[in-house]
Amino acid sequence: KLVALIPNDQLRSILKAVVHKVAKTQFGCPAYEGYCNDHCNDIERKDGECHGFKCKCAKD
């Protein structure tokens, strides 16, 4: 594994956190107006808005 090649445990956990954060980012959110509304309507049938780099779907 690529992570096993990184010797320092602290550095390894920092890199894992960065990769995890990037993987969860929805890049369409700030780039396209209405992206989150479409995203939330597709998955939850709710309205949505962009919050940073992630979509927030309306709560009941």
From Swiss-Prot:
Sequence ranges assigned to domain BetaSPN-type CS-alpha/beta in this UniProt record: 26-60
Disulfide bonds, paired cysteine numbers: C29-C50, C36-C55, C40-C57
Keyword terms, alphabetized: Disulfide bond, Ion channel impairing toxin, Neurotoxin, Potassium channel impairing toxin, Secreted, Toxin, Voltage-gated potassium channel impairing toxin
Primary location group: secreted
Pfam family, one: Scorpion_toxin_alpha-beta
Subcellular location: Secreted
Extra remark beyond the main annotation: The primary structure of this cryptide Pep-3 is identical to that of cryptide Pep-3 from other Tityus species (AC P0DRE8, AC P69940, AC Q5G8A6).
Function, as annotated: Inhibits voltage-gated potassium channels Kv1.1/KCNA1, Kv1.2/KCNA2, and Kv1.3/KCNA3.
Tissue-wise expression: Expressed by the venom gland.
Similarity section: Belongs to the long chain scorpion toxin family. Class 1 subfamily.
Cellular component GO terms held in the UniProt record: extracellular region
Protein name as annotated: Potassium channel toxin Tst-beta-KTx
Gene Ontology molecular-function annotations: potassium channel regulator activity; toxin activity
